[in-house]
């Protein structure tokens, strides 16, 4: 292929990337989420409720940070744990307080898509399936404050063995920009 045509093909194929970069410039400032803000949201959240703190446009993708509070949960008697799998969003859990058993991976039994108009789809993690997983086919680990677990998109995850509670932050990179950039939890506006 002649050099001028090769250069033209390269420029045409790169133009969408340039347009995207121009429409999503890298932010010029940091975003803070204080411990007091996290505590304020936790005080108003219901047990097992996932609360998005903020969703920030960080240039090439959105980044969301949520806080989740889970109440006591007994060990399953049948070796099966309920689970969720978020199709497009990876999560990083950072355990703040309490402890429990986190189950990840395995094959989802009886998967059902969460309705598209639910808060979990719109504000928290995008399209999600719920179901069950056999603990014997999954990774099972006890987590405590300071532990960090990275859960890739479409990996099911669920909890049991929570003796009192577990509170954890969830960092959620959103490369598809499904979550609403600029969102701030009403409790901390």
Outline where the language-model segments fall.
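Conserved metal-binding segment of the jelly-roll/cupin
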Residues: 142-163
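His/acidic/aromatic-lined binding-pocket segments of jelly-roll/cupin-type domains
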Residues: 83-85, 91-94, 140-141, 148-149
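A short, N-terminal "cap"/entry segment at the start of jelly-roll beta-barrel domains
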Residues: 20-87, 183-189
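A short hydrophobic beta-strand segment most commonly corresponding to one strand
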Residues: 164-182
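Bacterial N-terminal signal peptides that target proteins for export
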Residues: 1-7
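Bacterial N-terminal signal peptides
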Residues: 7-16
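Short alpha-helix capping/helix-loop boundary micro-motifs
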Residues: 133-138
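Short, conserved beta-strand element in jelly-roll/cupin
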Residues: 87-106, 116-131
């Amino acid at each position: 292929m002649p050099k001028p045509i090769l250069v033209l093909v390269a420029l045409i194929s790169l133009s969408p990337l340039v347009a995207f970069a121009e429409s999503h410039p890298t932010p010029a400032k940091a975003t803070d989420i204080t411990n007091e803000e996290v505590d304020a949201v936790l005080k108003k959240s219901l047990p097992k409720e996932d609360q998005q703190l903020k969703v920030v446009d960080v240039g090439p993708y959105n980044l969301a940070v949520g806080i989740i509070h889970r109440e006591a949960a007994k060990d399953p008697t049948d070796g099966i744990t309920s689970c969720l799998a978020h199709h497009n969003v990876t999560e990083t859990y950072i355990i703040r307080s309490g402890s429990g058993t986190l189950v990840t991976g395995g094959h989802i039994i009886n998967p059902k898509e969460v309705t598209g108009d639910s808060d979990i789809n719109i504000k928290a993690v995008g399209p999600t399936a719920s179901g069950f997983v056999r603990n014997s086919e999954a990774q099972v680990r006890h987590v405590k404050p300071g532990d960090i677990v990275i859960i890739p998109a479409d990996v099911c995850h669920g909890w049991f063995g929570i003796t009192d509670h577990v509170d954890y932050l969830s960092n959620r990179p959103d490369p598809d920009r499904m979550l609403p950039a600029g969102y701030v939890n009403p409790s901390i506006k």
